Amino acid sequence: MQVVRQEYPEAEVLMGTSTAGIPHAAIVAQMMGLPMGYVRGSGKDHGRKNQIEGRLEPGQKVVVIEDLISTGGSVLDVVSVLREAGAEVLGVASIFTYGMQKGLSRLAKANVKNRSLTNFDVIAAVAAEQKYIQPEDVARLIRFRDNPEDESWIGGEK
């Protein structure tokens, strides 16, 4: 809630991403006294065939609530749907980001501000400090984050 208040004080509506962002958006919206909705990955195949659920008026200032950002693809799809509906998307608030270069670049190119509660570097450092993972595991995870298409990190090769 603090991130949304501080980074997006003019927010009028919170929109969760389907499915994992919905409960987080609901909680934050309730705490802030804001309306909330969510965006499906695609329109329903019955009823009104809505992709956006919840009341959204053209021109309203929206913050998208997401659980995790990796490459940015799914959250950018949501932003696109909202913009097409006439919303002014102020940005995205997520719980976690890997900080993958591909995701950061895509968000920047789409002019989408992103604020996360935590990130890969913090989680990896705390996990290593608390001895949940070993230093070599951190190195492997960094290789994944920096180049997810290269699966050599899985086998533990250095």
Predicted regions and their residues:
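A contiguous pocket-lining binding segment that forms or flanks enzyme active sites
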Residues: 55-99
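Short glycine-rich phosphate-binding loop at a beta-alpha junction
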Residues: 9-18, 93
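Portal/gating segments that form or line small-molecule/metal binding sites
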Residues: 22
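Nucleotide/phosphate-binding catalytic cleft detector across ATP-hydrolyzing
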Residues: 7, 30, 145
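Active-site-facing substrate-recognition patch
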Residues: 1-10
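PRPP-dependent phosphoribosyltransferase catalytic core
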Residues: 80-158
